[in-house]
Amino acid sequence: MSDSVVAVSASPVTPQTASAEKKVAAKKPASASASKAKKTTAPPTHPPTQQMVDASIQNLKERGGSSLLAIKKYISATYKCDAQKLAPFIKKYLKNSVANGKLIQTKGKGASGSFKLSASSKKEPKPKVSSVEKKSKKVTSSAAAAKKKTISATKKPKGVADKKLSKAVVTKKSVDKKKAEKAKAKDAKKVGTIKAKPTTAKAKSSAAKPKTPKPKTTSAKPKKVVAAASPKKAAAKKPKAKTASATKK
């Protein structure tokens, strides 16, 4: 009897455990699909409505102010988004900005009029950096600092090599200077020897100059002899004239 009672009590336990396991298994994929759906939600392709409305009013540059329709058209054309879905957010921002003094309502009441930027809002505020961007900047700055440290550590042996190269360059320069000085000394010696030669040539020419006047004295003497000989011929001709006069008598 006891065995049969145990068997009857054990039989209803098995279906309950099976159903519980099925429920747990069914809950797991549902939670996984929900987490995947959260991850796959794409970020917005346009900036917030505040920036879009301010940019539209600033770029339209209407004297009487920009109307709600003009703002919607500008947002849909430039940012390529559905302005009708964003209409309640645009109206809310227009009302709040008029109350805060950021916008000036030139016509109408509420969100149905025309709006202009105030003098304080015309100054373009700096865009707020999100916390994610700040963290990314910190990470990049720390990575850049680590890279600088590694670069500085690797550059130290290069400094030793640079010192060796500088020493080699200095030695080469000193050798080149010595060679240049030797070449200059050789050139100076050559110039000294070349300059000494003309002095000897001048001395020779000055010594040879006194010898030239001697032939002049010899050439002048025969002229005097010719001049002395000419009167003798004239004297010889005179006796012939006397004989002619004697014959005439």
UniProtKB/Swiss-Prot annotation:
Disulfide bonds listed in the record: none
Places the protein is found: Nucleus; Chromosome
Domain H15: 45-119
Region (Disordered): 1-53, 105-249
Compositionally skewed regions (Basic and acidic residues) per UniProt: 121-134, 173-190
Chief site of localization: nucleus
Family recorded in the similarity comment: Belongs to the histone H1/H5 family.
Name of the featured protein: Histone H1
Organism in which the protein naturally occurs: Drosophila hydei
Gene name as annotated: His1
